[in-house]
Amino acid sequence: MKKMKVLSLLLVGAMSISMLAACGSSGDSGSDESASSGGAEASSSDSSASSSTASASGDVYDVDPFELVFSTTFQQTETGGQIIQYFIDYLADHSNGNATVDINWGGTLYDTAGELDGVSSGGVDMVALGHMPHLDVLNYLSFPGFAPGGTQAALDYFNTLIFDDPDTSALIQGEAEENNLKYLNVVAGGANAFCTTYEFSDLDTLVSGSKSFGNMDAAIFEYLGFQVTSVGPGDTYDALQRGLVDSTQMGLAPMVSMGWQEVADYWALDGTYTAGNMFTINLDKWNSLSADQQALVQAAADATEEYSAGLYDDAIEADIKTVEEATGHEFVEFSDSDIEKIWEAVFEAKAEAAINTCEPNGKKDGMITILKKAAEVTGYDWTAPEE
């Protein structure tokens, strides 16, 4: 029987850290050590360029003028849009206006389904890649897409796998290069939560009180003991209101933005935090930039990741307040044991799906290497298949 190791599952609160080094938001990670993780993929000449091109103040790069064409499905006013705008402003502010971005908001150039092909083909220079719809191509990104422990922990987890660990980063970045891509950072994605129409006090009463759990990802929640009804996010408000489902789980931010607090009174964070939306650049475009320009773009991506972490920590607090004011109930706080059980379900379900995705393409062994590191980083005692 697989068991969780002891996790230090402390919610990362308001942090005054420099940058998140991993994949959670649109930059590198939040700690000083992880802040350079995205930059770790840059060549040694890129690293030296960073010091040689910065001004005496250390934050202005002497670069020839250049432009990046950026496509995003986010609107400028959304959290994701604010993160991208930070990247744009950083480039301009740290190049005396010589680095500019031609930004296309709201999927006007490429929608979610098209943005991978768009950046891979060079139709656009950069995207904030929502990788989940593209796992059939980017197989090695199918590892569990969130982690326990808070915003910073999720970023550190993604950064370790994508940038810092020599074995896993070689697999993930190598696959990106095969598709003419380079990942620059990871962007924070916020907390995940349960909501229900019935009262519960812990994981046991959450599961036992449910007659119909609405979600598209049945494997995780069936592992926990729920009876799952397939319901998409766009239909969940109505399903909760009409009693077709009595409970669900998703990212806290979209749950609140879609108003589920109006039809579900009882809420709890599930202890996991998301990351992703890697700032991804066309590899040919990256190679066409000078070492100085590359150093600036990487620094902007690193700084943006840090910014995204703080933005999402603040957003989590604000969303919790919104829900509690609307429902009149405080969030249930799960015990460490409950959070361990939830993470076990997530890891087992996602690991099985990841291996099934990779095996037909001859990538099973590589994915097992990634999953072993993912388990190590999150403190989960995982036994790989056939071991």
Describe these PLM feature segments:
Residues 24-30, 54-156, 182-387:
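N-terminal secretory/targeting leader peptides
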Residues 151-178, 355-359:
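Short, solvent-exposed loop/beta-turn-alpha elements that line the ligand-binding surface or hinge
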Residues 1-67, 381-387:
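Short, low-complexity disordered leader/linker segments with a strong preference
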